[in-house]
């Protein structure tokens, strides 16, 4: 083996070493003086040789945009450094939700120690701001470090660590700008974060308008209750919609009172609207939600207080100011409580006026009196005073009792002819008497014999004052009798109540009576106990909570499927009744309507046509019956004093 060049043996050294010479390049260029071969090459100069950051291709690069980008990046790094400086205990879990305690503030290392292991599972948050929302892609404790900074209002915001700081500069800048601006979306999210949204809206309303919403409205528990007047408070309305809402609602309303104020949630509208027809809360909320472009849970909708003077004055005073837009006629409940003449018109309740009204309108039932008179409160001062009273039930009962007394006394003073005219005056003149006559002839009854018995029946002649209609079922006996009783405002008694001592009490206050569908036990009862009643003679009647009274039985009409002539045990009733048989079924047309109409108008025409045949005399002094003289008055007159 040949000797290698540069290797010397001896002097206690042996081995190989490399000798490198500095030579010129083949290009024969001199080596640069800047290169220092004595410095160790660590490769740091090749770190930025490959740029992994996102390259944004633009057509033209502006110097100002580049400067802004650099400044934003520098600001971001300064904020990141400040956040790291204010970070709590380094031993606290980054996913922990525990609050910083006083010990943690004094000693982060001591505050990080716990006796029990807390829950490491992250809680799901229903409402999360856009900047804190993360898709979760690639999330791990190693790759992403979540830091928390506690702001003055107590909210905790998370920021990203070192990862992604270089490649997402533009996205970080947009998130920083979005977190400082307040948009309608963020305001709605903040509103929805409230645990009790209704209470929050009520509190904001009182803060803005200086008056409680409950002081202006009365509560409807049901959303289906209808009302024409509604008070609405709308939150978060756009400014352009608020200004044009008066025009949008004009087509559906008769009166509008609109005022608005500005708050952090947008425009807040307070409205008093009278719609053209009654609407419930659900209908109003759906309609206004579409017009105002807001959800229904941002609306407070209740009817106004109609009897509150303070509420009426609020609407009146705010309506005359320049802060409200008012269109239409002012509701009467505001005028009644604010205008001076209406205040003077308020008077105490007068029972006689209520009784006079019930008498004139022929209303004798307590429930009808209470309902009808309460509806007159908006145009009758006495009815308004009635509603304000705490004794409404007593007044209604007293009014009904007095009205029935007056009606009963008026009826007793009238003869049968006057009573028929009195009843006919309340019915129209478009009737026809022929269907009644045709129906009687259809039942194979001699019309002259019927008119003779009917005349004695109406005149209440003894032993001729009971008219009996017998025959098979469905022959029109009850239809014929009920139509006559309804025209003459008679009463009906039922044998089913015969076990009571008071079942004949209605005969005391009737001009004519009817006993429908008398069965054999009923005929036996009449034969044993009520022979004098069928005679038309005075008899004693027991009345509930009253003493016995002696009355003359009014004309009594009886219908039955039993022919008393076929049984001798009722022979003592033969001479006390006038009996007519209806053998034929009641006729109906193809549509199921009666062929012969038996109604009030036809009965009126029947009595007018056959008035002379019934031998009702024309009274010369009809004033005794209240027909042509002055009408009955129970209200004391007022004396007109001359000045």
From Swiss-Prot:
Q: Which UniProt keywords apply?
A: ATP-binding, DNA replication, DNA-binding, Early protein, Helicase, Host nucleus, Hydrolase, Isomerase, Isopeptide bond, Nucleotide-binding, Phosphoprotein, Ubl conjugation
Gene3D superfamilies, alphabetized: 3.40.1310.10, P-loop containing nucleotide triphosphate hydrolases (3.40.50.300), Zinc finger, large T-antigen D1 domain (1.10.10.510)
Enzyme Commission number(s) from the entry = 5.6.2.4
Region annotated DNA-binding region, chain positions: 180-346
State where the record puts the cross-link Glycyl lysine isopeptide (Lys-Gly) (interchain with G-Cter in SUMO): 552
Question: Where found?
Answer: Host nucleus
Motif Nuclear export signal location, chain numbering: 106-115
**Which Pfam family, just one, is annotated for this protein?**
PPV_E1_DBD
Catalytic reaction(s) noted: Couples ATP hydrolysis with the unwinding of duplex DNA by translocating in the 3'-5' direction; ATP + H2O = ADP + phosphate + H(+)
In this chain, ATP is annotated as bound at 471-478
Per the annotation, the residue ranges of the short sequence motif Nuclear localization signal are 83-85
Q: Name one GO cellular component term.
A: host cell nucleus
Q: What is this enzyme's class at the first EC digit?
A: isomerase
Q: In what residue span(s) does the SF3 helicase domain sit? A: 445-595
Q: How is it modified after translation?
A: Phosphorylated. Sumoylated.
GO BP: any one term = DNA replication
For region Disordered, the annotated ranges are 155-184
Q: Which GO terms describe its molecular function?
A: ATP binding; ATP hydrolysis activity; DNA binding; DNA helicase activity
Q: What is its main location?
A: host cell
Residue positions where Phosphoserine is found in the record: 89, 93, 107
Q: Which family does it belong to?
A: Belongs to the papillomaviridae E1 protein family.
Q: What does this protein do?
A: ATP-dependent DNA 3'-5' helicase required for initiation of viral DNA replication. It forms a complex with the viral E2 protein. The E1-E2 complex binds to the replication origin which contains binding sites for both proteins. During the initial step, a dimer of E1 interacts with a dimer of protein E2 leading to a complex that binds the viral origin of replication with high specificity. Then, a second dimer of E1 displaces the E2 dimer in an ATP-dependent manner to form the E1 tetramer.
The molecule here is called Replication protein E1
Question: What organism does this protein naturally occur in?
Answer: Human papillomavirus 42
């Amino acid at each position: 083996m040949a000797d290698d060049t540069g290797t010397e043996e001896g002097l206690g050294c042996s081995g190989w070493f490399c000798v490198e010479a500095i030579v010129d390049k083949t290009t024969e260029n001199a080596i640069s003086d800047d290169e220092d071969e004595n410095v160790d090459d660590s490769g740091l100069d090749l770190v930025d040789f490959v740029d992994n950051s996102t390259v944004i291709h633009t057509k033209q690069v502006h110097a100002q945009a580049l400067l802004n980008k650099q400044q934003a990046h520098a600001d971001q790094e300064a904020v990141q450094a400040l956040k790291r400086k204010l970070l709590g205990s380094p031993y606290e879990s980054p996913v922990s939700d525990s609050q910083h305690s006083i010990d943690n503030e004094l000693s982060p290392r001591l505050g990080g120690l716990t006796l029990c292991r807390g829950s490491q599972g992250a809680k799901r948050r229903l409402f999360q701001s856009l900047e804190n929302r993360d898709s979760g892609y690639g999330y791990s404790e190693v790759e992403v470090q979540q830091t928390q900074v506690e702001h003055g209002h107590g909210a905790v915001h998370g920021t990203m660590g070192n990862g992604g700081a270089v490649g997402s500069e533009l996205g970080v800048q947009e998130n920083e700008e979005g977190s400082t601006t307040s948009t309608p979306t963020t305001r709605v999210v903040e509103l929805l974060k409230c645990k009790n949204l209704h209470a929050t809206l009520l509190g904001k309303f009182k803060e803005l308008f200086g008056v409680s919403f409950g002081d202006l409205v009365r509560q409807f528990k049901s959303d289906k209750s209808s009302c024409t007047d509604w008070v609405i408070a709308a939150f978060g309305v756009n400014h352009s919609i608020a200004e044009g809402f008066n025009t949008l609602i004009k087509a559906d309303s008769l009166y509008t009172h609109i005022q608005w104020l500005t708050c952090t949630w947008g425009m807040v509208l307070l409205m008093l609207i009278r719609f053209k027809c009654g609407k419930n809360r659900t209908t109003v909320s759906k309609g206004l939600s579409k017009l105002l472009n807001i959800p229904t849970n941002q609306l407070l909708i209740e009817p106004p207080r109609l009897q509150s003077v303070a509420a009426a004055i609020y609407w009146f005073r705010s309506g005359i100011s320049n802060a409200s837009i008012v269109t239409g006629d002012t509701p009467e409940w505001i005028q009644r409580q604010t205008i001076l003449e209406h205040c003077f018109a308020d008077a105490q309740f007068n029972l006689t006026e209520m009784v006079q009204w019930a008498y004139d309108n022929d209303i004798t039932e307590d429930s009808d009196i209470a309902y009808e008179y309460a509806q007159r409160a908006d145009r009758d001062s006495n009815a308004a005073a009635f509603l304000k009273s705490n004794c409404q039930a007593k007044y209604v009962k007293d009014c009904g009792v007095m009205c029935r007394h007056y009606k009963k006394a008026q009826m007793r003073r009238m003869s049968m002819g006057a009573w028929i005219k009195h009843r006919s005056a309340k019915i129209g003149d478009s009737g026809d008497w022929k269907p009644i006559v045709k129906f009687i002839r259809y039942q194979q009854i001699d019309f002259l014999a019927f008119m003779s018995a009917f005349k004695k029946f109406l005149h209440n002649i003894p032993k001729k004052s009971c008219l009996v209609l017998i025959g098979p079922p469905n022959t029109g006996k009850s239809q014929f009798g009920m139509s006559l009783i309804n025209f003459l405002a008679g009463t009906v008694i039922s044998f089913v109540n015969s076990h009571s001592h008071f079942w004949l009490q209605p005969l005391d206050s009737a001009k004519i009576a009817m006993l429908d569908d008398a069965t054999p036990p009923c005929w036996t009862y009449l034969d044993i106990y009520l022979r004098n009643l069928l005679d038309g003679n005075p008899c004693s009647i027991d009345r509930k909570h009253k003493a016995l009274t002696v009355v003359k039985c009014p004309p009594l009409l009886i219908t039955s499927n039993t022919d008393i002539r076929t049984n001798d045990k009722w022979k003592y009733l033969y001479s006390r009744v006038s009996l007519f048989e209806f053998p034929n079924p009641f006729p109906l047309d193809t549509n199921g309507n009666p062929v012969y109409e038996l109604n009030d108008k036809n009965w009126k025409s029947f009595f007018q046509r056959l008035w002379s045949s019934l031998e009702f005399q024309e009274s010369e002094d009809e004033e005794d019956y209240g027909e042509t003289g002055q009408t009955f008055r129970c209200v004391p007159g007022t004396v007109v004093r001359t000045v």
